From Swiss-Prot:
Keyword Repeat among UniProt keywords: no
Transmembrane parts of this sequence: 182-202
Domain GOLD: 34-122
Classification lineage: Eukaryota, Fungi, Dikarya, Ascomycota, Saccharomycotina
Protein name: Endoplasmic reticulum vesicle protein 25
Naturally occurring in which organism (per UniProt): Kluyveromyces lactis (strain ATCC 8585 / CBS 2359 / DSM 70799 / NBRC 1267 / NRRL Y-1140 / WM37) (Yeast)
Length: 212
């Protein structure tokens, strides 16, 4: 059973490497909206973001870059970028982060845009394995095995995080259901008590008027 689990983790490590690449265009506008790419990173993981754009500074458009996570931490804020840009940071906690761009048109009446190629690597994939191989004098096979081992550990950690998150969400859901049930019971009790009071009040009223 343990060997089967190890095989599953190895396959996951081979097929779900933490590398994300995308290419897209952003048109320039005098009132631009941010275009964001979101990714997830675990606590303590290294994140490497490589950005390559066409165009140049002063070509009538200003491409701005923002890198921030869902907790409000900002890792990079660059204005008027062009060419190649690299962003490196270590995640302080497990969270999602956004790589956002906005393209500001500096000249009216012209249709301009920037092409962006974005590569995001995290965890073991963000490490410089050539440097590690040279410094520790490892064989290529040893480097690959070590990389797969670290990637497998990261997958296990992410599974554990997702499991813990699912448990927290389940606890929250159960707590919400319990509160809704208690509130519903309280509303029913209040309505029954109010109905009984109204019936008693009407009986006393009719008796006072000698109707009954």
């Amino acid at each position: 059973m343990k060997s089967f689990a190890a095989c599953v983790l190895l396959l996951c490590a081979l097929f779900f490497e933490q590398v994300f690449a995308v290419r897209f265009d952003i048109p320039a506008s005098t009132k631009p909206e941010q275009v964001c790419i979101r990714d997830f990173v675990s606590e303590g993981q290294l994140v490497l973001i490589d950005i390559e754009t066409d165009g140049s500074v002063g070509d009538g458009q200003q491409l701005n870059l923002y890198v921030r996570d869902s907790n409000g931490n900002e890792y990079r804020r660059n204005r008027d970028i062009a060419g190649e840009v690299r962003v490196v940071f270590t995640a302080p906690q497990s969270t999602s982060f956004d790589v956002c761009f906005e393209n500001v048109a500096q000249v009216n009446g012209r249709s301009l845009s920037r092409s962006i190629e974005l590569d995001i690597e995290s965890g073991s994939e963000a490490r410089d394995w050539n440097k590690i191989q040279a410094s520790e004098k490892l064989k290529p096979v040893e480097v690959e095995l070590r990389r797969i081992e670290e990637l497998t550990d990261e997958i296990v950690d992410e599974f554990n995080y997702l499991k813990g998150r699912e448990e927290r969400l389940r606890d929250t859901n159960e707590s919400t259901n319990r509160r809704v049930r208690n509130f519903s019971i309280a509303v029913i009790v209040v309505l029954v008590a109010l109905g009984a009071w109204q019936v008693n009040y009407m009986k006393n009223f009719f008796r006072a008027k000698h109707i009954i």
